[in-house]
Amino acid sequence: MDSVQIEQKSYEMPPRDGISIAHFLTVADVERSAHYYEKVFGARILTMGDGNAPPYLQLANIWMILNVGGGPTPDKPKVTLSVPDPNHINSFMNIRVADIQACYELWKSRGAEFITEPIPKYGETRCYIRDPDGYIIEVGQSTELKYG
C-alpha cells in the first residue's frame, strides 16, 4: 500500500478503503457500558460480542470497542488492560458539538453525570461527563475557531 485515504464518506468497520477510527475502552461491565453509550449518546450497538469478541458500537463517525481487559496477550506481551482510576486519567474522548447547551440538557436527561455545567474556556465552551467506569468525556463547542 502506497497511501492511505483519510477523507472518506463511509465509516464502515472494517473499512473498505481508507481508515476508520475505533476508540477502545476497558470497562468493568460491557453490557452496562454498551447500553450507557446507547442511551446517553445514541450510539448504535452493532454487536454485543460473543464472549470472545468484544461489543462494537458506532457513535457518530467513530467506532467504539468495549472490553473487560486482561492480558498480557501474545500480540502485546507486556501490556495489561484495566479499568482506569477515575481520578488519574491519561486520555479521554472529546466530542465536538454544534450546540453545547442543547447537548448538555439532552444527555443529562438521559443519565449523563456531568462534572460541571458548560464553562467558557480558551475559545470554546466545554464540560465533562464521567461514564460508569470513570472515563471522562469532554463535550465542547468552539466559539472562536474559524474555518477557511
Named regions from a protein language model:
Residues 2-22, 44-95, 104-130, 141-148:
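Vicinal oxygen chelate
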Residues 33-38, 107, 134:
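Conserved active-site tyrosine of GNAT-family acetyltransferases
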Residues 99:
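Conserved catalytic-loop position in the HRD/HxD motif
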